[in-house]
C-alpha cells in the first residue's frame, strides 16, 4: 500500500482500478473528465479505455462488456445522463453480469454546467441504487463497494459525486498494483438479453423485490453513519452537504 495525494476524480479512478476494472468508457465534461484520464495515466494492463462519441455510446459500450462479465465504468457529467437515458432505462430492466458503475457527476451551483439537475432522480426513475460520496476518501472506497453491489444484485449502479467532491484533494491509501478481473465472456441467452415485453413484465416484479433487499442491505452499509448523541439537533445529510452540516453542528 502507498499514499497518493489526488483529486476526487483521481480517487474514483484509483478505486475502480482497485476493484478490478476491465473497461472504462466516457464522454468528457466538467466535473467528471479527470476520472477517465486518470485511469489512462496509470498502468492499466487488461483495461480498455476510450472516449466515446457521446454518452449514449459510452453507456452501450460498457453494457456490452458487462454482459460478458467484465467490470465496467461509465463517466459523464450530469447533463450527459440525459443523452444516455435511453439505454439506461432499458438496461435497468435487462440487468447486467459483470459489475457496471455509471458515474454521473452533478454540478450544484452550477459552476460549469447548463443545469443543476439531480442524478439521484434518475436512479429513482429507473429503479437502480445510487452511491453519493461526501469526500474523495469516501469516493475511493464507495466506488469499490458499488462494483460489489452491482454484481451481487445484477444491476447497474449510479455513482453521484458533486463538483466539490470531484475537485477536492485528499491523501488516500491505495494498492501498489491492480489486477483486472478475469471474466467468463458472453454466453448467448435470448431469454436473458433480449428485452421483449414479456421479459420486461417479469423483470419489473423482480426489480421491486430486489430493491427491498438492497434497501435492507444498505441499512447496514458502513458509510451510512450516525454521529454524536443526545436530542439537541439532528442533521440528515448526504454528499458534500454532510461536511457543511458537520461544520455547522460544531458551532451549536
Q: Can you annotate each of these PLM segments?
A:
Residues 1-136, 141, 162-165, 178, ...:
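Thiamine diphosphate
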Residues 2-9, 133-244, 249-250:
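Flexible, low-complexity linker and terminal segments
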Amino acid at each position: 500500500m502507498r499514499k497518493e495525494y489526488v483529486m476526487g476524480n483521481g480517487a474514483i479512478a484509483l478505486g475502480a482500478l482497485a476493484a478490478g476494472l476491465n473497461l472504462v468508457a466516457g464522454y468528457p465534461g466538467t466535473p467528471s473528465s479527470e476520472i477517465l484520464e486518470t485511469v489512462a495515466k496509470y498502468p492499466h494492463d487488461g483495461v480498455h479505455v476510450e472516449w466515446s462519441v457521446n454518452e449514449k455510446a459510452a453507456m452501450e459500450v460498457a453494457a456490452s462488456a458487462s454482459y460478458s462479465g467484465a467490470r465496467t465504468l461509465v463517466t459523464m457529467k450530469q447533463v450527459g445522463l440525459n443523452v444516455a437515458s435511453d439505454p439506461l432505462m432499458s438496461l435497468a430492466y435487462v440487468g447486467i453480469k459483470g459489475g457496471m458503475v455509471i458515474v454521473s457527476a452533478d454540478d450544484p451551483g452550477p459552476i460549469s454546467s447548463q443545469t443543476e439537475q439531480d442524478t439521484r432522480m434518475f436512479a429513482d426513475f429507473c429503479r437502480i441504487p445510487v452511491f453519493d460520496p461526501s469526500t474523495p476518501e469516501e469516493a475511493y472506497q464507495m466506488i469499490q463497494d458499488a462494483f460489489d453491489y452491482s454484481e451481487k444484485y445484477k444491476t447497474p449502479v449510479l455513482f453521484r459525486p458533486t463538483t466539490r467532491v470531484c475537485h477536492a484533494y485528499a491523501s488516500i491509501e491505495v494498492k501498489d498494483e491492480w489486477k483486472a478481473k478475469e471474466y467468463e465472456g458472453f454466453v448467448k441467452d435470448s431469454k436473458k438479453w433480449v428485452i421483449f415485453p414479456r421479459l420486461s413484465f417479469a423483470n419489473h416484479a423482480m426489480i421491486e423485490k430486489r430493491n427491498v433487499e438492497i434497501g435492507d442491505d444498505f441499512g447496514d452499509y458502513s458509510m451510512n453513519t450516525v454521529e454524536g448523541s443526545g436530542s439537541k439537533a439532528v442533521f440528515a445529510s448526504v454528499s458534500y452537504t454532510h461536511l457543511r452540516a458537520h461544520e455547522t453542528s460544531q458551532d451549536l
